[in-house]
Structure formats: C-alpha cells, structure tokens
Regions:
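Positively charged n-region of N-terminal signal peptides that target proteins for export
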Residues: 1-4
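Bacterial N-terminal signal peptides
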Residues: 8-15
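Sec/Tat signal peptide C-region and signal peptidase I cleavage site
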Residues: 17-21
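Active-site core segment of subtilase-fold serine proteases
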Residues: 23-97, 102-104, 112, 119, ...
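Extracellular S/T/G-rich loop segment that most often corresponds to the catalytic His/Ser-adjacent loop
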Residues: 26, 32, 186-251
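Structural recognition of the beta-strand scaffold that forms the well-ordered cores
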Residues: 27-31, 94-99, 132-139, 171-175, ...
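Substrate-binding/access-modulating region of protease and related hydrolase catalytic domains
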Residues: 101-191, 203-206, 228-240, 263-265, ...
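Short, charged, surface-exposed loops that flank catalytic or proteolytic processing sites
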Residues: 249-261
Length: 272
C-alpha cells in the first residue's frame, strides 16, 4: 500500500535542482486527446486507438499530424493544455504526444479504455531509448468501482506494462482525480506501481476537489495559466510533475522517486 510522500509546493522553478546529465534531452510521453502544434512544441506525434479513427483512418499512426486535429474543441483541447503546462514547467525536454481519444462523427470525445492506455504505454516501451523517455503523463481515470474491500480494479496487462516501464527507468504518472474523494484515488492511479498525483493550490493548500487516499504518491501544483486560459485540476498537476520528473531525473526510476520524496519538504521551503 502506498501513502502520500511529498507536497511538491510550487517547486517547479526550484533553481538548485541538479540538471539531467545526458547527451540527449529527456522526454515525457503525454497520453491525451489531441494537440495543437501551433501552440506547443511537440517532438513527435503518435495515434493509438481502439477504433479506426486516427487521421489515416486506421488504429495506429505516427509522425507529423498523427495527433493533431483541425479544430480541437469539445474537450480535445485538453491535450494542448497538458502539453503547454509541461512545457512551461520544463522547456528543456521533448514532448512525445500520443493521442488515444477518437472523435465521433459528431465531433465529441469517443471511446477509449485502459486497454488503449496499455497499448500506448507499450509503444513507449518500444521507443523509450529512441526518444529518451523518462516519464508518462496520463490524465484519464475512473471511480466506477465498489466501495467495499480493495476497490482498485487492476487490469493485469496494464499493471505489467507499468512495471516494465518502471524497470526501464520510466515513471507512469496518473491523475488522482477531481471527485472530492478523500479516501480513494481514481483507477488506474490506484495501481500500486503507478505514481498517483493529487493537486495543491497556489498557496500550498491541498485542493478540496483533489482525490486523496493511501494510494496517493505526490501532490503537485494544479493551477496553471497557459495558452490564454487558467487550467485547474489533477490533470495539470500530473503533466507538471511529469515535466518536473524529467527535470530532476536521477538516471533511473527509484532514485528519482526517492529524490522527490526525500526533498519535497525542502523544496517547498526553499521556493516559498
């Protein structure tokens, strides 16, 4: 069972953090709706869906244009917001954007599941070395599960993928959720090997909307002003922490996790 290990209070500008030592810039993979590349810089685009609704009318596409939309509205702008937050926190990294949400014929958000997430994360496994990916940021979650006993409905395939990524040095960060639940985070954030991220406010307060519980790993800033909008929620906190993870990467998963855990209080004090 996990427990909250750190309040990362507005730490994203902490100047004393060690820089990542590598010839190639670190990268994070953002799994989300779609991205507007006129507003954020994306190093590479991928589309992975359960339906044949990628721009090439297939379930898989990669390369320029794979994750973009002509008119990203009706919720599809969410991916642009997450990318902008990550880029603001850490401009010295690459963003690999993986679109996993299809558009219906009417232009609304289509169906995606934890199997979609798993397939996208398997792509990260195959391409981790090529792009130097050190973290994934996933905003999606669900709380449609029983309140009795152990509530986390683990998809073993997804869990195995998270464990494999962890062994390769890649953190799988999931949003805890914005459902005001003070005992449980959303699934898949509740998976023990996932890094569950809750939200704090600009004053360092735990946001009332943020889910919490024994499965939570970190709180991070959940309020960000990007692309002309104020974005609030655990999704933004997750994207921000993924970018900060890349900024403070210690060469492997566990040393980075421990660095953030052991220094979170100090970080909060030093930037206050």
């Amino acid at each position: 069972m996990k427990k909250v290990v750190g309040l990362l209070v507005i730490l994203f500008t902490a100047a004393f953090l060690p820089a990542v030592s590598a010839n190639q810039k670190p990268a994070i993979a953002i799994l989300d709706t779609a991205v507007d590349t006129t507003k954020v810089n994306v190093a590479y685009e991928v589309c992975i869906m359960e339906e044949k609704r990628c721009p090439n009318k297939q379930t898989f596409q990669e390369g320029p244009g794979s994750a973009t939309m002509i008119n990203p509205i009706n919720g599809f702008e969410h991916g642009t917001h997450m990318s902008a937050i990550a880029q603001k926190v850490n401009p010295n990294m690459d963003i690999i954007f993986i679109r996993i949400v299809p558009a219906t014929n009417s232009g609304t958000l289509g169906i995606y599941t934890d199997n979609t997430i798993n397939e996208a994360m398997k792509w990260v496994i195959a391409n981790k070395t090529k792009f130097n990916i050190v973290a994934t940021s996933i905003s999606f979650g669900s709380n449609r599960f029983t309140k009795k006993g152990h509530y986390c409905p683990v998809n073993q395939n997804l869990r195995n993928t998270i464990v494999t990524l962890q062994s390769m040095g890649v953190a799988s960060l999931f949003a805890a959720g914005n459902r005001y639940d003070k005992t449980r985070v959303d699934y898949p954030a509740c998976i023990s090997e996932a890094v569950a991220v809750g939200a704090i406010g600009e004053r360092g307060n735990i946001e009332n909307y943020s889910n919490t519980g024994a499965e939570l790993d970190f709180y991070a800033l959940g309020t960000h002003d990007v692309v002309g909008r104020r974005i609030i929620g655990t999704s933004g906190a997750t994207a921000a922490l993924a970018a900060f993870w890349a900024k403070s990467y210690q060469g492997a998963y566990q040393p980075t996790y421990d660095f953030l855990k052991n220094n979170s209080s100090q970080l909060a004090v030093n930037v206050g």
